[in-house]
Amino acid sequence: GQIKLAQLHLGRAEFGGVPTNLQREMENAGVLIRLNTSVDPDLARETVPDIVVIATGALPYPAEIEGLEEAHVVNAWQVLKGQANIGGRVVIADWRCDWIGMGLAELMARNGCHVRLAVNGMTAGQTIPQYALDAWLATLHELGVEIISHIRLLGIDAEDAYFQHTLNSHSVVLSEVDLF
């Protein structure tokens, strides 16, 4: 499921072929695939499998911050699927410092949004291999994405996002925001 989402990031269409390729590989290997099947001891005794792989799917990670009910908040999945009403001034709080925050920042900036990418690490994308990271940071710079490092999201309200600097514990407020 998340592979289908990954292909929606700009420049990541290659992920679109992964499910088909994996399905073909499993068919070639003679793997029996059962979808939407409850797994219990009776099924295991009946089928006597060599191995069982349970794919349970995923859900977006829910933000647990103060002010959710006051602000316009969406998750990455909604943005990628085109299900989000995105304003012109966006703050992305990226606690993972990986592909997702940078991909969303690029997508929204290319769609005309003023984007501030707030990360709690040393830099946006710090978990991405260096050769890819440098080029992507350059792209975000060219698009005017403002990257603010070392800040952790604490709360939000209708127009502001409240952060704590992770190195000195000072308060950081990002104002005039339409979307979080």
Give the predicted meaning of each segment:
Residues G1-I3, P62-A63:
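Short acidic/His/Gly/Ser-rich catalytic and metal-binding motifs that mark active-site loops
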Residues L5-R12:
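Short glycine-enriched, charge-decorated loop/helix-capping segments at active-site entrances
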Residues F15-Y61, E70, N75-K81, N85-I86, ...:
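A Rossmann-like FAD-binding core segment of flavoenzymes
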Residues E66-G67:
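Beta-rich extracellular carbohydrate-active architectures
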Residues I86-D98:
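Beta1/beta-strand and adjacent pyrophosphate-binding region of the FAD-binding site
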Residues G101:
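N-terminal Rossmann-fold NAD(P) dinucleotide-binding loop
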